[in-house]
């Protein structure tokens, strides 16, 4: 079992390679390979995943610290094997962001389902957290 603590200085993601999700993303299990793209806007790094099989299947990602979140969770032995992770320092954590409608209008981050990427092996999974220790920092701007 590997303990994962999200760091401020996460390893950089190689945008020239394909990310492989061995089990897909929950709800999109048939889509296992994704290109990752990156854009910086107003100091915010935004990433998005695009399925190699269907360009209409995309996900927007941000680093958790954008929302003042810092993760501390354990990977199961199975998850560690899927990611081919040997050290926690190989892993980067991202959140899927979606645009809400109605009373939930605006951008919403899925904090209970972070994307965990082994940046050295270009393997990823969505970690569905049942219980987690998420430190939230409220920033007055």
UniProtKB/Swiss-Prot annotation:
Keywords carried by this UniProt record: Bacterial flagellum biogenesis, Chaperone, Cytoplasm, Translation regulation
Keyword Ribosomal protein: no
Gene3D superfamilies for this protein: BH3618-like
Subcellular location: Cytoplasm
InterPro entries the UniProt entry points to: Flagellar_assembly_factor_FliW, Flagellar_assmbl_FliW_dom_sf
GO BP terms in the entry: bacterial-type flagellum assembly; regulation of translation
Highest taxon of the lineage: Bacteria
GO-annotated cellular components: cytoplasm
Entry similarity comment: Belongs to the FliW family.
Job description of the protein: Acts as an anti-CsrA protein, binds CsrA and prevents it from repressing translation of its target genes, one of which is flagellin. Binds to flagellin and participates in the assembly of the flagellum.
Subunit architecture: Interacts with translational regulator CsrA and flagellin(s).
Protein name: Flagellar assembly factor FliW 1
Annotated organism of origin: Desulfotalea psychrophila (strain LSv54 / DSM 12343)
Taxonomic lineage from the root: Bacteria, Pseudomonadati, Thermodesulfobacteriota, Desulfobulbia, Desulfobulbales
Gene this chain is encoded by: fliW1
């Amino acid at each position: 079992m590997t303990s994962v603590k999200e760091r401020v200085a996460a390893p950089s993601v190689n945008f020239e390679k394909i990310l492989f999700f061995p089990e897909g993303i929950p709800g999109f299990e048939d889509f296992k390979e994704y290109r990752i793209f990156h854009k910086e806007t107003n100091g915010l790094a935004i990433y998005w995943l695009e399925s190699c099989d269907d360009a209409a299947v995309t996900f927007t990602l941000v680093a958790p610290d954008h929302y003042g979140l810092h993760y501390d969770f354990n990977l199961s032995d199975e998850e560690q094997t899927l990611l081919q992770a040997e050290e926690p320092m190989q892993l980067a954590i991202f959140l899927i962001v979606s645009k809400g409608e109605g009373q939930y209008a605006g951008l919403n981050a899925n904090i209970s389902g972070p994307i965990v990427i082994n940046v050295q092996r270009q393997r990823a999974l969505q970690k569905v957290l049942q219980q987690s220790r998420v430190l939230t920092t409220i920033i007055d701007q």
